[in-house]
Amino acid sequence: MVRLREIPRTATFAWSPGAASPLIATGTRAGAVDVDFSNETCLELWDLGLSSQDASQELQPIAKIGTDSGFNDLAWTDYEDNSRGVIAGALENGSLDLWDADKLINGSSDAVISRMTKHSGAIKALQFNPKHSNLLATGGAKGELYISDLNNITNPYRLGSAAARADDIECLDWNKKVAHILVTGSSAGFVTVWDVKTRKESLTLNNMGRKAVSAVAWDPEKPTKLITSTPLESDPLIYVWDLRNSHAPERTLKGHESGVLSLSWCPQDPDLLLSSGKDNRTLCWNPQTGQAYGEFPVVTNWTFQTRWNPHNPNFFATASFDGRISIQTVQNTRTDTARAIADQNQALDGADFFAKAQTQPQVSNFSLPKAPKWLERPCGASFGFGGRVISVSLIEKGKRASKIKITPFEVDETVAKSTETFENALKEGDLRSICETRASQAASDEEKADWKVIEALISENPRKSLIEYLGFQDQDDETADKLAQLGLNKEEDEVNGKSAKESRGSGAKKHKRLQSMFDANPEADNFLSDLAASKGAKTNNPFQIFNGSETEADKGITRALLLGNFEKALDVALKEDRMSDAFMIAICGGQKCIEKAQEHYFSKQTDGPNYIRLLASIVGKNLWDVVHNADLSNWREVMAALCTFADDNEFADLCEALGDRLEEQIRNTKDKSLRKDASFCFLAGSKLEKVVAIWIEELRENEQRSIETATDDTSFSIHVRALQSLIEKVTIFRQVTNFQDTERTKDADWKLSMLYDKYIEYADVVATHGRLQVAQKYLDLVPEKHPEAEIARNRIKLAMRHATPQRSQQTVPTTRTPVNKPLPQASMYPAQPAFSAPAAAPAAATTAPRNPYAPPTAATTQPVNPYTPPSAAATQPQTSNSYAPIGGGGYTPAGYQPPQPPTYGTQPLGGSVPPPPRASNQSPATVTTYTTATNLPAWNDLPEGFTKPPTSRRGTSATAAATISSPFPNQSPTLSQGPPPPGAPPTQRAPSVPPPPKGTAPPPRVTSPPTNPPGPSSAANPYASLPQSPPMGSTMGVPPPPSIPRGPSPYNAPPSMPPPSNRYAPSPATQAASPQLSTRAPVPPPPHAAASPYTSQPGSHPPPANPYAPSTPPPSQLPMQQAPPPQATSSRPSTASSQRKAAPAPPKYPPGDRSHIPADAMPIYEILSADMQRVKSRAPSSFKAQVEDAERRLNILFDHLNNEDLLKPNTVADMAELARAIQARDYETAKTIHIDIMTNRTEECGNWMVGVKRLISMSRATP
């Protein structure tokens, strides 16, 4: 708990009443010696200044007045005539003094209300009545007990007679429910209940042998319950009494090491009690259950008084004889001093930790197991993500049981309705009807125009539709009408009056004259038709190519045409400015001549009509000139030209350029009416990034306009409708134009960043209304690297998460239910290895010492690995180390090759290696069957201080720690002696197994079958190799014991050619029996190889039959006098396996990448990372290193999941189950699964497994 303030006084104290900022009144403690040996006694008032965050400043009294004597007790009541109340002091000289708190604070000289000396001796205790603040009870020496009325302070009356008792009244307390009931405690051990109304004793309790009473306190809610304490150092007890059975206490609280001096029962929560005493400690209890929650920081002298704040029970104060009154709170568990010391100790290395860590002072680090009653809410509600409201209420009033209700909630019902309607319309695919509906419902001209343009883009010929939308429909009819108005198509215009002639002007007159001139020659109509006659036709109109009257230009053109040199003829015609002749020649000369003629024509017409420049741009395919230089008042005509003539590759960019010009015009002229025209250009060019900016600007303006004119709608509803309209336009536009976002893979600088922000906002809105799939759909349109989108996507995934189905497995599943039936019996003929040395004399069968994490064992049977080839059996003892590395020894010399089981089909031979010798100080352990796993701590377990407070209050002992010779402190000594003579029985006793630590053990995963002594037990590890049994009667020397190789993994190749799981063992191809001897002598196994607690325990009995393995011929029994020679083996790897074509390595992703975690493993990442963040945010700073290490190891696991390596499918499924158990706070199940994976799948475990273990422990300890 946090110490907020300190008052540097050895004094009794009282809290100020009322809800104002808390003050404390202190009176110099009678009989106490001050640090400066001053004998001054006074009453002081202190303002704690709790609103200030600076707790280092020393407090100064705000009021002070001298007294004639020291104080034994103080009381402060909220009296009606005084705004700050009245302070009463119980003085050592027997005087009862009353002060006006207001006048004390103001410094008035008449602050003393009265001074009364009715008591003949010292007043030991006093208290105001909680129901009637004018009544004051005082008790003191010689059993004197007075009741005073502030309205008539000079006439108190006494309870009891003077001759009744002569013992001192040490304490008293008014009943909190019945105003006229008072209890007193005396030095003679009498606890007396008084009825003030009748002025008589109601009941007397015998305080367990008339032990002196130091404090009494009534239950704040139950009027018949009270608590008493004794100040005796030999018997520091607190008794809980129920007056309905006053013969004996209901409960006894034991926790203090010396006499209890003060009690304070929290008036707001009857489950909280403070006690302080001569052991310098202040304890917090639950008096209803007798549970001690913990202790507050220990001081250096007696704590003689402790009190809750009457108005705000978050605060309490404790006075001690070390010269301080500490004001503390129950809302935190660490002090600044403790945090600084913890950080200092965190930096200590292994060399000086034990030398310096004991200087750490005792601090309080407990937390209340449940919220105090004043913080409990009878009901509550919270909005949940995904359109849910979670409400909590009491099942029954007065009981702590609650019910939780989750109900759907929508801020605006129209949001869900419009979203659903739009999504259904999209599924139907009728985009045109959507556009028509939205256009008819548009609230502004801009919005209506946008939907019309989008509707035009849906048609089969979007450009033609855009031209029609621009108003250029029926061009042919319009041109014909205009020509008709000019009179060019009417013959009767020749003679139809003056008005027609005047309208045509001079051009019309010339036309009429020429027409009438040629009408007189009817043969002219057949001229051209005559020229098109057949090859043999002749005409009666002869002509001369050269008649002598030609100009040089005519001759040059004629000669060039005769020779087919159209380019030369064109040059002559252009030089002579004969444009009509030039175009005719260019037509005959081909495209090059046509382009040359056109270029010359346009160069000569620079000052001609405007249509000439337009025609030049069209002919020259240079519409950029029109886009950049045409007047913006004619943007519609420019847009029509683009829709008609622009190339498909340039059309979008031309439209964008025209829109950019219009946007620039908007900025220059502030004419927002052009915004609709720019939107048209951007829509026609499919430039989503440009039109979105305009739409968002229109959204803000329309929203603001709607808010100003709205009467019933809320601002949220208006904003959501506008946002919905924007999303609908963008969605339809993307589908119509088949828009492809090419920037989703970028990390930043997105062109559509404004749209992405709206997508995220819209996803949040629809998710709030319960449409999670719709939200996911739009979040998928946002780049993966967008920071806000990543957060939103994680929220959606968590809200949409379902139980991940487990992958189908080909292996036998691991059973987690207890198994109580016996295992199948093994064959009576054990398989024998190909070669073994003679065995030692038989000895009593033994079992390995207790392994708390090993599976349960059977006496005469052993489960079978259905995927392991038949192998010989051997007995291998294990040490008592529960934390040894997996796989037996941690070190194997180079070249060492343990004996291998025979390959399939070979005839096994008799004989086997004997068991390794035991150390001289060991004896066989007794056969024991365990049904529950013990909770033994490991070297990497969570520090003890993380979950429970330190038990010693004096500090760490200075005794030097014992030398640790092993990195695993509980590891047994290694075997160091040679083998005993054959047949030598063990003579000395084995060391005892260390007891398990305190704590509840996890439930057993497999119940051990019945033990049948004296047969050995064997661990039920389905992945371990079958053990070997020792033969009998051999007289040869005993070779060093081999380590038992693990069987092949059930996920690898079939048992005929499996790669060995032991990296030091040869491949299976080299394990076949060979008639030749090996040229290399066998290397002995490493000494002192401690067996792993997770490998199978040995046994002398054969294993049960393997129902999945090929049958093995019965072994032939060889003579026991001599073993056959060893068969040759090779240490080289298998040629077949080494030459086997390697599969392509899976892709490796960088550390920290989580985007490739498969769906079935995603719950592991999400749950564990979320729980790790919860622990990280609440863990004390002294455990920062452990928390960061656990987080680093979990990231290793997440990297494996992201790369889909190391962990097999069944392990992934089990880890998902473990994660769900942690999420449900089912830590026993999580721990059981963790032990199972660590025991049976060690090859998949790594550094990450330690992080999972630490997270389980930290999560359990974190509230």
Curated annotation (Swiss-Prot):
UniProt biased composition (Low complexity): 830-863, 925-934, 952-977, 1062-1076, 1128-1143
A GO term for molecular function: structural molecule activity
One Pfam family, short name: WD40
GO (cellular component) term, any one: endoplasmic reticulum exit site
Source species, domain of life: Eukaryota
UniProt biased composition (Basic and acidic residues): 495-504
Biased composition range(s): Polar residues: 805-818, 873-883
GO terms under biological process: COPII-coated vesicle cargo loading; endoplasmic reticulum organization; protein transport
Positions of transmembrane segments: none
Alphabetized UniProt keyword annotations: Cytoplasmic vesicle, Endoplasmic reticulum, ER-Golgi transport, Membrane, Protein transport, Repeat, Transport, WD repeat
SMART domains, A to Z: WD40 (SM00320)
Primary localisation category: membrane
Sequence ranges of the WD repeats: 5-47, 66-109, 118-158, 164-204, 208-251, 255-295, 298-338, 382-407
Keyword Repeat among UniProt keywords: yes
Entry-linked InterPro entries: SEC31-like (IPR040251), WD40/YVTN_repeat-like_dom_sf (IPR015943), WD40_repeat_dom_sf (IPR036322), WD40_rpt (IPR001680)
Spans annotated as Disordered: 487-510, 801-1158
Family: Belongs to the WD repeat SEC31 family.
Name by which UniProt lists this protein: Protein transport protein sec31
Name of the gene encoding the protein in the UniProt record: sec31
